[in-house]
């Protein structure tokens, strides 16, 4: 019993020992007076740590949010009863929160202890909110006591501003939800790299703002007015725009109008470049890609459209596509890291719990085993009870016979039941049943899709019947499944639960409709949810299944993100209500829908700003509400900018980050599954017939041969699944032309890669493709001279270049055509040229067909898909030449198809070909995602049809609701001015985007998913009322949920997954080529850098005067001075503004001259210091030089340009442009600042590197734009330019440049759907074009839908994501662990090496290596705190080859640094891994010269002396000294110096010396002075770093300095192991004393002047007794620490 008791006790003790959550540590004293035992403090602690208390507080916060949301803001501080009640309730909340703060402060202390109340971020937030609340209440009371009016505008404004703080309370919910904290943490962690990017963006904005200020200042203040009035002259639907009275800008075309100044400017004078602040806001607005085209068009109107586009397009490319995508790169990196952490934390937690359980189990087992020992005592009682039971059984024997019959029947029934269940289970699991269900679902889908507006009654009846039949079938399916699988296992599956939910709601719906309780509409939406069943298909489609699994996975992580997003929206909506509630009512009578007047409306507005659609319009309203473009008004834009940055850039990019993260996991999942399946198959085959394994190996090869579709590498053609599993299967990704069609064109090995390496690396020596054996055209045999000649011509590089040139020329001629007048002179010339081009291309194809044959045999011309493309393009040209009359529409189509000519270049430029092939692979892989997205789109479209069909009609007069009422005329205020009324006819119109049938619904939804124009559609839907009826204002605001759910699901989530997929695919494709080379991406980049880098030349002048200048120019003070001056210059530029006084202008001119003078002086100083060659060697200096020249010209021009000189208007205009052009040079000085900051410099370096990765991607984009622009010109070129529509003077397809600009606008998503509508059929034709009478409205075509949607999808999803993929690849270093070496660290090595090797000879003394590496910070160098001994050990492991003159080379040193830091082939047999590494380098970088390779990795058998061996001997020597010293201390005597004995010296002997008699003679190698110099250099390095005292010189002990004569240095001869002469070897066991050599050469003069001065001083110091004392004490101090090492 004792044992048992003790075991139980042990168990309970263990339980006690392990509390689940440790309580937060409490300080011993709070508020200086309350100890832990104080009863009041105990009470506070108990309350604060009581669970329900936390719940109560969270509920209070929630209630507070609700109260804030109910509050109705009103204009002019009006109020109503609800609001006054809420004011009172606010006091209660404040009271609760104050008490909570007080209790916590008492419990945990206020601020002084480590875990005090204010040491926690959330508590600081709480405390601020509470104290501000209390403060505002006090202020109110004081103002009441003083008898002031109720807190209104004047006194109460500060109170209201303080009130806005309450809005932050919902943030406290975050501290309650752990999953929120992962998302928040990753965002907070990302803040540091994000700040770098923010700086870069800010810098861009400043530069562009100042450029804008210089170029466009004051240009936006003229517009067209009617003569002698203040009324602006505009066309219908057009905002007033700037104009110019002279030059290239817009002229006033309306009769009776003139161009006059004093117009405030666009957007009520908010959008312009008149001063620095407004310019920055305008530039920022352009970077967000919202409304940038409007700004561009206004500038065009003001100054002409020749060059402003350069400014805006470059801004969008750099700002939006590049820099803002960096944000994405950073966030996804951080998110991945954060999730990894959370994962490992979870794993650790699980482990701990597992251990705890094991411990418990052990306790119980002990308990039980102890108990079993006592068990025998109990046995008798058991036997006795059994006897009793036996007795009772005999009594009931008679009753059993009656029951037996029943049991037999029951058993029979159970048998049948079991059989039936088994049969039905087999049925349910069979493929037949599965496909049956799928067919029923598809039928269901078709029936739902047929529904549309104005459908015939018969169709409606048919749909109802079909619905009921299908419902019955689905109910049967459910019942059968439940019967077959049983309740429990049926409801285990998520799909089944969903199914039963849908069926039950369907039944409910039928009952409700039949009993007329509710209208059929409400629940018919649920019918659409049945469509989700389509996802059942995924059961047998593995890759799709994994995709859906990964989507559901990301839904989990995205749920917490959505919660965060929602919190964020609530806070900003409440804040918006406090600031703008009831203020958006202006005099112009226009109804604004995006307001902050009620809470739901505010939420929608905030959501709209998050998606970035028309957020600028809301911001302009906000600014106008606070008094327009004044100081107070403009401060409002801070709210919108913060909302936009945090919401759009940060939170929405986290969506993408999560998507990319989870997709990568799904890919791994798929490939892992594939690998397992293959393994299983292989084992099966092996078991079935062992002899077949050989054939099995050939299976893959055959599979690859079978793959059809020429020209695309086999990898691209393997099925999607196999492509995904490629990672785990070993296949040869680029079989040498082993499949039909390509073997006539044997390609050099260029791997598929979205980021092709520079062509230099890909040896593009084209091999001539052999002729096929068969005869061509049945005439020419392979030996036929004509055919051989054709073959030779085709394969000549000059011929290929010639054809490329003509492809280029023909493309230019296509772009030069005039789309409006087909019969113009220009077009006639071009058509003659066209004939020439067609003849040349036809000749080329005939030659090729002659050489290779047409298509009958393997390897002939038409067996290659790219050749077929060539042939079809040329064929189209030939046919269109044959049919001349342009009236036939076929010819028009054929003429359009000539546009595909540039595609022929793909077959000629290999790099481009591979980008295209990579795109194909990506498109194939994306198939699954497209499928899922289309299904969801379709489902939402069906729901949309149910909700909105026929409800988007409206009358121009909003008071009329039906089509019958909408007749006649009504009055409208012109330009929102009630004084000018005009009569307008009423028109009954239909919205352009609507949900009348499923297709138009999908179109509308597609535009919503691109975030363009969705608020208009949303408010249309909110106002929708009934079929064929007009809108009623805010009729059902809850409909917004449909749009918001759709946007979150499709636009945020699916589209981002789509983007993520493209990125992941490209990255995988990029890695594909390297998958066998054992180096990861980072290692490859670093090795490549180490192989390609060359040392920098550092010029140090010999001339003493020049040296002085050089010394000044290179000093850091000079740098800082220039930095300061550039900043001053920036400020002076930024202070200029429109309408400045003459004195101010004069001052700024003087300053400009002064700065130009200063920078010119700087240039001359640098030229003097570096001489021309040295100066122009640095790109930054070249940049400086250009800027100085430009600035000087600018100064001269502005001096010449005096206002007194009369000139013709045109001349004035052109001189203006030249002057403003030179003004740019002032601004470009700013860019010099970029060369200073370390982080920004790294960013820039990577930036330029990613540009290098883009050339082919860029080429592809150019081709895409070219083709679409030419098609656009041919198809939409004739549409008339009408101001007020979307095809107008600024955006049209009439010239090639205009068409490209318009397409660029569409690619950025600026109202592309409006342009689509403006190009669709039935538009007015241009008066100059060739339409027939009565055909004025026949321009435009329905082809516009296909054209714009395909262009948008290609651009937005594929092409721009190529940018993102490249950026994410190159910028991963921003979020990577900085302790991992990356290529961005290696620049520092080049810079510091230059100080030791100013002539850039590529060699330095090996002694300098230690000091060099200690000056470079880790991870590349050792850092200045690295002890010398550790540094030497690292050098031993680096082991660079040492030249005979004692120097090491640049590349070898850098390479070995990279190699040791990244652990590339450092394990195992050294020589073997060296060989392997040589092979890898040869494989990846084929052009590496053997000389360089031997330098960085010496080949086997190369008896080279290396730095490693050299330093190893030194370490041995040092350990030996220590060993000797310990012996002395142990035996208590100091051995006498024996004349024959000398300490061991580092170095290698020649064979002759080893075999010589007793006396060894030693020579000195190359350039090195005796060992003294080595020791001295080491001591010098230590003194330089101020570490001498701590580490005791280089190796701790400096015995050699003060024992005996100076020791000699070794020669470097062979690589034999160290052997010593036998003399004196008996003295000690392990280390051996050597005879002291007689001969010793005098030390040479040190050539390095720097060293020699120091060494002189050192020599003196080393002889002082002082030094020896320090030395001895250090030796003692050091001995203990190294005992362990010595014993090793």
From Swiss-Prot:
II repeats: 417-663
Localization, UniProt: Membrane
Topology in the lipid bilayer: Multi-pass membrane protein
Keyword Transport attached: yes
Gene Ontology cellular component annotations, sorted alphabetically: T-tubule; voltage-gated calcium channel complex
UniProt note on tissues of expression: Skeletal muscle specific.
Comp. bias (Acidic residues): 740-749
Subunit structure: Multisubunit complex consisting of alpha-1, alpha-2, beta and delta subunits in a 1:1:1:1 ratio. The channel activity is directed by the pore-forming and voltage-sensitive alpha-1 subunit. In many cases, this subunit is sufficient to generate voltage-sensitive calcium channel activity. The auxiliary subunits beta and alpha-2/delta linked by a disulfide bridge regulate the channel activity. An additional gamma subunit is present only in skeletal muscle L-type channel.
The protein's name: Voltage-dependent L-type calcium channel subunit alpha-1S
Record organism: Aquarana catesbeiana
